[in-house]
Each structure stands twice: as C-alpha cells, then as structure tokens.
Amino acid sequence: MKIGMITDSLGALSFDELLDTVADLGIERLEFAGGNWSQAPHLALDRMLDSAPARQEFLAKLDDHGISISALNCSGNPLHPGAIGERHREVTRKTIALAGLIGVERVVMMRVVRVDRATPMPIG
C-alpha cells in the first residue's frame, strides 16, 4: 500500500516545499487539484498544458522525490448554469487534457445538481 494525499491540504507551501515535506513524511502519491473549487496551489494548469518543458520539469521533480501522481482533481460544479458552470467546464476539460499529456489515468471530480432553486449551491 502507498500513502497519498491531496496537495490542497498543504496549500500554503510552495511546490518545492510541498515535495520536501511529503517526502519527509513518507508519502508516495499525490493528488493535484487543477482548479474549480481549489485554488490549485501546486499545479499551473494553463502553463502545464502549453509547455512540454514545464510538464517535464514538474514530473522530474516528483520523480526526484520518489513521488507519483495518484490523480488530478477538478471538483467543481460544471452543471451550474451561466458563467460559473462554463468556467468549471473549461477547467474540467483542461484538467482531463493535462492528465492525458502527463500519463495520469485518474481524474477526480464531483458534480453538483441543484434540487430546487431554493436550495443553496456551493459556487466558486
């Protein structure tokens, strides 16, 4: 068994500090958030999509620390109507595209469905 965590739980750390910390703790797998409800503190989604060298550097740093990616996460509300939903759908599409580019087979997401207009929904 390998122990993992989502990187948002150490969101105040830089990417390099995150890697040092989790390696010191014996954590071997990380789930990186690409956006939506997360601020994505450790994954520059657009930069990674646009730059093969950025992807290679990211993966090399993980490898140098003995860490692999368990999943990318894009939890949000892509079913929300209007601009919020469109923004979340865009991040979802980009996260899935990045997963393909870096060989990650798992993308974590959740959907939120409004039961009725009186029910408040989380938005971000």
PLM ranges: what are they?
Residues 1-4:
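Extreme N-terminal starter segment of soluble prokaryotic enzymes
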Residues 6-10, 33-37, 74-77, 112-114:
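Active-site beta-loop-alpha junctions enriched in small/polar residues
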Residues 13:
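Residues that form or flank phosphate/diphosphate-binding pockets in enzymes
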Residues 16-38, 98-106:
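Catalytic domains of carbohydrate-active enzymes, especially glycoside hydrolases
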Residues 17, 55-57, 61-64, 78-124:
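Active-site acidic/histidine proton-transfer and metal-coordination neighborhood
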Residues 31, 71-73, 108:
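Conserved beta-strand positions in the central sheet of alpha/beta enzyme cores
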Residues 33, 41-63:
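Glycine-rich, positively charged N-terminal anion/phosphate-binding segment
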Residues 67-69:
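N-terminal glycine-rich cofactor-binding segment that shapes the pocket for flavin-like pterin cofactors
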